[in-house]
């Protein structure tokens, strides 16, 4: 079968176009628990991330609900590859292999880890990315599931700065933390426009919002 092939350029990433449709590119989807002032550090536990003297770990706990849990599980139980920074990978590698019954999809998913120093796998299957921005531009062109980024603040910043994020799935909590690692620190990026795809408002004020890159 003869195909008419050409290339189109978007966000410095080439996507293959064929005469009968566009080959689907893998998406990078950032999923974050975020406070009103943009903090994403240590949402789940007191000692999850105490770097830089952060003492407010576990700040999402008071807002837990069955409805929120159900929405989070829709992402946890989908088809994905994990894309993580080194610290998040090390934390999750110590925890999730021992709780495979809770999140079996994470056990079989390929874990892509942005790190120039970590070379020993803690959680198979794992692929280390020593030049993550360059490598991800190529990986997005390959067949496979979308990439899910949880936590991994430094990696998330780099992905936004390089306009590689295709979707955001933000869980916004009605709390101001005042300090800690933020999703968008110091305005160190160019403007990027997203379209609101869906949002869910919980009775306790938590908002789950889904955005897609225009």
Where are these regions (language model features)?
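Enzymes that bind and transform nitrogen-containing heteroaromatic metabolites
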Residues: 12, 19-214
């Amino acid at each position: 079968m003869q195909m008419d092939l050409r290339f189109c350029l978007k966000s410095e990433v080439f996507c293959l176009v064929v005469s009968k449709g566009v080959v689907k590119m893998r998406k990078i989807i950032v999923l974050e628990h975020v406070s009103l002032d943009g903090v994403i550090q240590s949402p789940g536990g007191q000692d999850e991330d105490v770097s830089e003297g952060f003492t407010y770990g576990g700040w999402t706990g008071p807002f837990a609900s069955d409805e929120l849990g159900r929405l989070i599980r829709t992402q946890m139980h989908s088809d994905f590859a994990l894309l993580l920074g080194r610290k998040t990978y090390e934390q999750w590698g110590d925890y999730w292999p021992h709780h495979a019954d809770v999140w079996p999809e994470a056990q079989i998913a390929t874990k892509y880890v942005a790190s120039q120093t970590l070379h020993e796998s803690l959680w198979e299957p794992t692929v280390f990315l020593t030049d993550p921005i360059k490598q991800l531009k190529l990986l997005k062109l390959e067949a496979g599931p979308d990439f899910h980024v949880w936590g991994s603040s430094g990696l998330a910043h780099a992905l936004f700065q390089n306009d590689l994020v295709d979707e955001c799935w933000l869980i916004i909590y009605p709390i101001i933390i005042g300090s800690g690692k933020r999703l968008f620190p110091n305005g160190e990026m160019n403007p990027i426009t997203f379209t609101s795809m869906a949002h869910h408002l919980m009775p306790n004020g938590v908002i789950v919002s889904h955005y897609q890159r225009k």
